[in-house]
Amino acid sequence: MKRYATFFLSILLLAALTACGSGSSPSGKDAPPVRTPMGTKDTEQTSDLEQAYSDLVERFRTLVSDPFGQDSDEPGEMGVLETARGMGDDAPYEMGYLIEDLSGDGIPELAVGGLRGMTNALYTLVDGKPELVFEGWYRSSYVYLGDGRFYYYGSNSAAESGQGVFALTKDGTRLECESFLFTGLNSDGDVVVYSNETGSWDIAESEKSDMTAEEFWALDPLGEPLPLIPFYGAEAG
């Protein structure tokens, strides 16, 4: 594999790069609200923070249990519904949630998605209330890599696909790009791979990579699926 492919895969395997600028923020916020992390992780504090997600968990349980009987255009719910409808009757068994501190600031996040990898929605708490960090669906998906990092795969068209590593900010309110690759057509109509560290799909803001399209499509980073609790059988709040 050529030089850039080796470099990019090293990022995925070692996760050693520091976070870059905030040019790709799914939440669209330039200055997230100030949060107060837990000082002491005792059982009572943790329980209170987790309880803040109880209504959301039950909402997602309802969507997953009867996806064809529900409809929603609410950010955070559309990707969950899409995945649940694709799974049909298996959705309550194959989808779940996890309340865990993924950013490392002492405040737990809520992740919802498939047990086998894709995260459809991620929330954190701001001023004690759930706030959507990002949403994933079939053509714009996120898989957990570990250490607060997610691998992104998306597609805008047959010729435009993107892959990259994004990390949660320390306060957990948004994602920051570490490395991003995407394909586009050059003036001759050939598929070319471009790279940047902002998450931009704009060729003018990117550099041409020496990675071939075949190498791009062959990228297969090892994810670390979150240990989600299936909605079926989980204790209702």
Please state what every model-predicted region is.
Residues 1-9:
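Positively charged n-region of N-terminal signal peptides that target proteins for export
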Residues 120-133, 168:
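Beta-propeller blade repeat segments, especially FG-GAP/WD-type strand-to-loop junctions
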Residues 93-102, 141-149:
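Beta-propeller blade termini
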Residues 116-121, 159-163:
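Loop/turn residues immediately N-terminal
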Residues 16-19:
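C-terminal motif of bacterial Sec signal peptides marking the signal peptidase cleavage site
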Residues 23-66, 153-237:
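Acidic, small-residue rich beta-repeat scaffolds with periodic aromatic anchors
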Residues 103-113, 148-152:
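Acidic/hydrophobic-patterned starts of short beta strands in beta-sheet-rich repeat architectures
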Residues 39-92, 129-141:
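Blade-edge motifs of beta-propeller repeat domains
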